[in-house]
Amino acid sequence: MEKYHGLEKIGEGTYGVVYKAQNSDGESFALKKIRLEKEDEGIPSTAIREISILKELRHSNIVKLYDVIHAKKRLILVFEHLDQDLKKLIDVCDGGLESVTAKSFLLQLLNGIAYCHEHRVLHRDLKPQNLLINREGELKIADFGLARAFGIPARRYTHEVVTLWYRAPDILMGSKKYSTPIDIWSVGCIFAEMVNGRPLFPGASETDQLMRIFKILGTPNSQNWPDVFKLPKYDPNFPVYNPLPWETFIKGLDDTGIDLLSKMLKLDPNQRITAKQAIEHPYFKETN
């Protein structure tokens, strides 16, 4: 720890406090300190998971893990430092980001997620607060505390993942067999938030979250989601809503952008576009 000085608290992650610090050369780093409550408990499984995943992932749109320091009663992860997160940027840009900026961030996010998915890693907690941005306009995915290597076919996982507003309807209805489409749903929610300047589905509870999704995208049925009836929390008495036209709730997005968003926010996870397919979508054809 002697290598770093000038600690300044900048946030809290899934399981630890994050500080900004500098080394002797004046370079800035983000230090994530994980307190080890009891010596006999050892390192939290979430921390071990994040370390093992991040050590394997090397991509320009994924935050770099430089060092791991095992100090007395605490573990310190040394990450590259970025100036701010996407949530803060959206908050200061009244009415949403400029279309060229939103497009650039979305493409970078998809590139990072496609890389994760190719390496059999689900992030499981994508939200604007976990997307870091530097002054050059580079976006990097952070906070892999909930990430988990996935097998084929999809295994049964806990459904208590992803902050409520970015949680897919299949998870909300109790699906424990899920895969890459849960990250794509979150990406779609983030895309809409960048464009609109506010969250698309800001639910107050799991039930409220589902109802907000259904009121906009329509209630699932055997036509648009054949397997929905198999989910533990599916209710045949859900109120029936018809889908709204996209332009009524998404402002300032052209037809190709709406087409891409609609493919990310499919109710049925099996119908959602993959990250790799999304990168090839016509929406990005004008992007350098």
Curated annotation (Swiss-Prot):
Disruption phenotype: Normal asexual development in host erythrocytes, normal ookinete and oocyte development in the mosquito vector, normal number of oocyte and salivary gland sporozoites. Normal transmission into the mouse host. Phosphorylation at Thr-14 or Tyr-15 inactivates the enzyme, while phosphorylation at Thr-158 activates it. Its cofactor is Mg(2+). It comes from Plasmodium berghei (strain Anka). Belongs to the protein kinase superfamily. CMGC Ser/Thr protein kinase family. CDC2/CDKX subfamily. This is Cyclin-dependent kinase 2 homolog. Disulfide bonds: none annotated. One of its GO terms (molecular function) is protein serine kinase activity. It comes from the Eukaryota. CDD domains: STKc_CDK_like (cd07829). The gene is CRK2. Signal peptide: none annotated. It is an enzyme of class 2 (transferase). The modification Phosphotyrosine is found at Y15. Serine/threonine-protein kinase. Involved in the control of the cell cycle. Required for entry into S-phase and mitosis. Probable component of the kinase complex that phosphorylates the repetitive C-terminus of RNA polymerase II. The active site is at D125 (proton acceptor).
